[in-house]
Design a protein with these regions (language model features):
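Hinge/lid segment of periplasmic solute-binding proteins
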Residues: 76-94
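N-terminal secretory/targeting leader peptides
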Residues: 1-71, 89-306
Length: 306
């Protein structure tokens, strides 16, 4: 999407070459370093992938702050992303420019091999796979489960052997990795975190372009963002259907049950603001953006439903 738009809208003045996997860099940290140095122009990562350089981006992983896609998309297309961009530029001495935040795979939900999870008490004692980052481990502990960092490639076998009994992933990842074949049969659609995709560009390379080409690039990232908003929705519908057809148990919490999860996870916000530089500032910006988005949607619903 980005390549086609930018190359056509610039009449070929801007070319886009796409390098997959480790063609340009060995891991996420190395890739971001390459962008900061200017040897790589653009790189996509997750909040966890960027947290080593700018820990405050983990605000996107804080649970139960955005209710649904409409809220999330309104937030991420507005001033909140600009706020995060400015904080990122400051944290990297003007090197890394956040161009947009899209979506990588829908929403994170809790899934496990043992039982249906309807309330936080059902999480008690479950061994939940997390990444090594602190924030997701704090969330799992807050809900009464045991965080167990396991490398992604080892997760299938870890489900089979019982080393872990659950995870916090999107349904497309669950089905793509065939985790139900390893015993993952219970998914609770709590939607605790939006799976953000963060696109960074070398700031000097961007600012060194003429105004008209900068506009083309900005518009290209807007087109890319919209495409990433749409694709996971379609893929998720197909993945949910396949999960249920395969015998999986798919549970949708009631509003009251979801409120119980949010209340139990409340201490994670306290941990974030107390332990992450810029945490209080970026969390306040996110909450303000969510409140504004919810108010706009409430007005729209009032008009559309009556």
């Amino acid at each position: 999407v980005f390549k086609n738009f930018v190359e056509s809208a610039s009449n070929g003045r801007v070319g886009v070459e796409i390098f997959m996997g480790t063609q340009l860099c060995g891991n996420g940290a190395e890739c971001l370093e390459g962008v900061a140095e200017g040897s790589i122009d653009v790189y996509i990562t997750t909040s966890g992938g960027a947290a080593g350089i700018m820990p405050f981006v983990q605000v996107l992983d804080l649970p139960y702050l955005m209710a649904d896609d409409r809220v999330a998309e309104a937030v991420l297309t507005g001033d909140f992303t600009r706020k995060m961009r400015n904080m990122g530029l400051e944290a990297t001495d003007g090197a890394l420019r956040l161009m947009t935040i899209g979506n990588t795979g829908g929403w994170r939900n809790f899934a496990n091999t043992r039982r249906r999870v309807q309330s936080p008490s059902d999480m008690e004692g479950l061994k939940i796979r997390t990444v090594v980052a602190d924030l997701p481990q704090e969330l799992v502990r807050a809900l009464g489960a045991s965080p167990t960092p396991i490398p992604w490639p080892e997760l299938f076998t870890s489900f089979q052997t019982g080393v872990v009994e659950g995870s916090k992933n999107g349904i497309t990842d669950i089905m793509g990795m065939k985790f139900p074949d390893a015993g993952l049969q219970y998914v609770t659609l709590d939607g605790h975190a939006y799976m953000g995709a963060l696109w960074f560009m070398n700031n000097n390379n961007f600012l060194g372009m003429p105004d008209d080409l900068r506009r083309v690039v900005v518009d290209g990232f807007s087109q890319l963002q919209q495409a990433t908003f749409a694709s996971p929705k379609r893929k998720s519908i197909e993945a949910y259907a396949a999960f249920v057809e395969g015998g999986g148990d798919l549970y949708v919490p009631s509003p009251a049950e979801k409120a119980m999860f949010a209340a139990a996870a409340g201490p994670v916000q306290d941990w974030f603001t107390g332990n992450v530089d810029g945490g209080e500032e970026i969390l306040s910006a996110l909450k303000d953006a969510v409140s504004a988005a919810e108010a706009d949607l409430a007005t729209a619903y009032a008009a559309d439903l009556n």
